[in-house]
From Swiss-Prot:
Cofactors (names): Mn(2+); Mg(2+)
Organism per entry: Salmonella heidelberg (strain SL476)
InterPro entries listed in its UniProt record: CoAse, NUDIX_hydrolase-like_dom_sf, NUDIX_hydrolase_dom, NUDIX_hydrolase_NudL_CS, Nudix_NudL
Residues annotated as binding Mg(2+): E83, E87
Protein name: Uncharacterized Nudix hydrolase NudL
Disulfide bonds: none
Family the entry assigns: Belongs to the Nudix hydrolase family. PCD1 subfamily.
Length: 192
């Protein structure tokens, strides 16, 4: 599938037609969720954040809004929506949730469920200075081009795992964020 002319309608029909399949068993027990905010435009965008540099974990990394499930969250989707509101001021009622991707294990011990949602283009996104240093929009068609991701095999604690690397403008996109974007591309039928 060629992503260069990807429209929102095409993305939605492909995502809803090809249901995600869980391909591996997750190992982590602690639950987290992220929102993959697709901006409603004829040529859709993807909202990403850069985490604040002072954070203990993943400082300065490009990420989706999200975080750990807490006791007030009714579901993984509720957790993703709450975190998106806290981090970038996206009101939960403004998100049209279209589905979830299979959970992925993080190196920090979380099982992370990506929640895909459509958001209006005119939201006044605002970064929470406590957690986010920047909010930016990337064209979804570019984010879903598999050729932009480069593999790096990392050996950690006697185990090997593959990390994906990419760039957008001056942002370095890698790790779980790049992996989730690749999985989303594969989910809608982009061929490697």
């Amino acid at each position: 599938m060629d992503t260069s002319r990807l429209t929102l309608d095409h993305f939605l029909s492909r995502f809803q037609l090809l249901r995600p399949q869980i391909t591996h068993e997750t190992l982590n027990q602690r639950q987290a969720a992220v929102l993959i905010p697709v901006v409603r435009r004829p040529q859709p965008g993807l909202l990403l954040t850069q985490r604040a540099i002072h954070l203990r974990k993943h400082a300065g990394q490009v990420a989706f809004p999200g975080g750990a499930v807490d006791s007030t969250d009714a579901s993984l989707i509720a957790a993703a929506l709450r975190e998106a509101q806290e981090e970038v001021a996206i009101p939960p009622q403004a998100v049209e949730v279209i589905g979830v991707l299979p959970p992925v294990d993080s190196v920090t011990g979380f099982q992370v469920t990506p929640v895909v949602g459509i958001i209006p283009p005119n939201l006044p996104w605002r970064a929470s200075e406590d957690e986010v240093s920047a909010v930016f929009e990337m064209p979804l068609a570019q984010a879903l081009q598999l050729g932009r991701y480069h593999p790096l095999d990392v050996y950690r604690r006697g185990n090997s795992h593959r990390v994906w690397l990419s760039w957008y403008e001056h942002y370095f996109v890698w790790g779980m964020t790049a992996n989730i974007l690749r999985e989303l591309a594969l989910q809608i039928g982009v061929k490697p």
